[in-house]
């Protein structure tokens, strides 16, 4: 498995480093730090002065970046796998996505920036862009890392299931994990049919969803995972959070 571990020196970035102890040995592990060096925005400044300031800032950030990568490398678990360090200049999101394409990565690991919902909507977080646009699986770490023993895997449909099975075939975890596969059937009372007929229709749809999620769980059990399926009716976000709470208790 080819992994890109993107770091920026934040607390969540270091938590992303810590989660590597729970991932399997990488075929290739790339430590990536992207430098977004802004040029001075002062029109009245002489071009040569602005360029000198830019070069000084860039050199300082490069030195800080190299120290960060060395620090991260020293924190990796012994089983992390062959590691290379990459320090690149450019937009963090574009740089990470470009490297994922370039290296044909199987997984991108990084920490969330923690902008908050308002700033994230206005500016767009790096992690959100990676999650949306990455050509491979992504693992976004938001908060202190705990041992990875149970995984809740919500699936919306066949394309989700195929992507999940494809990734899990890589055996990405260092130790055995228990998988709970979940599908949520959003349901509102239709104008027709009504009463007992509507209830029967909902029951039939839930049975089909249960069969579907169990069939995916069976595929994962066939490749060595402990897996079971859960199908429920309700609002997806609410039901997923409730299931996560149940698994933690």
List the predicted regions and their residue ranges.
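Small/aliphatic-rich secondary-structure junction motif
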Residues: 1-52, 150-199, 219-221, 225-230
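Gly/Ser-rich helix-loop-strand patches that form or flank binding pockets
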Residues: 12, 22, 93-146, 241-249
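Short, conserved clusters of charged catalytic residues that mark active-site
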Residues: 15, 91, 125, 163, ...
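Aromatic/hydrophobic pocket-lining residues that form π-stacking "cages" and hydrophobic walls in ligand
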Residues: 20, 72, 96, 130, ...
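Structural beta-alpha unit
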Residues: 39, 55, 59, 63, ...
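A short acidic, glycine-rich active-site loop
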Residues: 51-67, 199-211
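Fold-core signature of tandem repeat domains
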Residues: 68-69, 165
């Amino acid at each position: 498995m080819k992994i890109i571990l993107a770091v920026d020196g934040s607390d969540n970035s270091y938590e992303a480093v810590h989660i590597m102890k729970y991932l399997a040995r990488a075929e290739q592990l790339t430590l990536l730090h992207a430098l977004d060096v802004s040029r001075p925005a002062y029109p009245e400044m002489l071009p040569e002065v602005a360029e000198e300031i830019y070069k000084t800032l860039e050199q300082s950030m490069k030195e800080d970046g190299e120290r960060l990568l060395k620090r991260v490398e020293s924190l990796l678990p012994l089983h992390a796998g062959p590691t290379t360090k990459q320090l690149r200049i450019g937009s963090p999101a574009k740089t990470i996505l470009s490297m994922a394409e370039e290296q044909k990565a199987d997984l991108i690991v990084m920490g969330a920036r923690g902008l908050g919902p308002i700033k994230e909507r206005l500016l767009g977080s790096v992690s959100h862009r990676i999650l949306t646009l990455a050509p491979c699986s992504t693992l976004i770490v938001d908060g202190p890392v705990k041992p990875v023993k149970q995984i809740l895997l919500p699936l919306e449909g066949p394309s989700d299931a195929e992507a999940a099975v494809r990734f899990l075939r890589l055996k990405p975890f260092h130790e055995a994990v228990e998988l709970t596969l979940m599908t949520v059937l959003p349901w509102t009372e239709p104008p027709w049919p009504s009463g007992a007929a509507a209830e029967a229709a909902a029951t039939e749809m839930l049975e089909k969803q249960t069969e579907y999620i169990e069939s995916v769980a069976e595929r994962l059990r066939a490749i060595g995972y402990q897996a079971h399926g859960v199908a429920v009716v309700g609002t997806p976000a609410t039901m997923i959070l409730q299931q996560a709470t149940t698994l933690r208790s």
